[in-house]
C-alpha cells in the first residue's frame, strides 16, 4: 500500500497553505462581492495578484446567517487585518452585487484605517441581455 502524502502548511477554515507574509504592499484593491447568500472580500495588489481573502462562510457563518450585514462586516475585517499587518495604507474599493453586506463591508473597510482613494460600484448591469427567470409564485 502506498504512503499517504503529508499535507504541508496550516489547515484553517478549509484553506491549506500559509499566507505569503514576505511581500510589503503599500497600495491595493479591495473587491467586495455581496450576493444575497454570502459576501466575499478579496484583497489584491495593484497588479491583481490575490494577497488575502475571506468570506462569511469561512468566518464560521452558515446558512441564512451568511447573507447578513454582520457576517459581511466580519469577513471584511478578517481579510483586511492581514494586509494591514503587511503594510497596506491605501486602497481602491470595488463593490459588486446587490447583497445586504455591501454597506456593512464598506463600513468595516473605512474603520480599518486604510485610506480609500475611491469606491466604485462594478455590479454588472445588462443592457437588456438574457431573459430573466420567471417570477416565483408562492
Curated annotation (Swiss-Prot):
Localization, UniProt: Plastid, Chloroplast
Keywords attached to this entry: Chloroplast, Plastid, Ribonucleoprotein, Ribosomal protein, RNA-binding, rRNA-binding
Gene3D superfamilies linked: Ribosomal protein S11
Signal peptide stretch: none
InterPro entries: Ribosomal_uS11, Ribosomal_uS11_bac-type, Ribosomal_uS11_CS, Ribosomal_uS11_sf
Pfam families the UniProt entry points to: Ribosomal_S11
Gene Ontology MF terms: rRNA binding; structural constituent of ribosome
GO terms classed as biological process: translation
NCBIfam families for this protein: PRK05309.1, uS11_bact
Description of how the protein assembles with itself and partners: Part of the 30S ribosomal subunit.
Protein name: Small ribosomal subunit protein uS11c
Organism, as annotated: Illicium oligandrum
Amino acid at each position: 500500500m502506498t504512503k499517504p502524502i503529508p499535507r504541508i502548511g496550516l489547515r484553517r477554515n478549509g484553506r491549506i497553505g500559509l499566507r505569503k507574509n514576505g511581500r510589503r504592499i503599500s497600495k491595493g484593491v479591495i473587491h467586495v462581492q455581496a450576493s444575497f447568500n454570502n459576501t466575499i472580500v478579496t484583497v489584491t495588489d495593484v497588479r491583481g495578484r490575490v494577497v488575502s481573502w475571506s468570506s462569511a462562510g469561512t468566518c464560521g457563518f452558515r446558512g441564512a446567517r451568511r447573507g447578513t450585514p454582520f457576517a459581511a462586516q466580519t469577513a471584511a475585517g478578517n481579510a483586511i487585518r492581514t494586509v494591514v499587518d503587511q503594510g497596506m495604507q491605501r486602497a481602491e474599493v470595488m463593490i459588486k452585487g446587490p447583497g445586504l453586506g455591501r454597506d456593512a463591508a464598506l463600513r468595516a473597510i473605512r474603520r480599518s484605517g486604510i485610506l480609500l482613494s475611491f469606491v466604485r460600484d462594478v455590479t454588472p448591469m445588462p443592457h437588456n441581455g438574457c431573459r430573466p427567470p420567471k417570477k416565483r409564485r408562492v
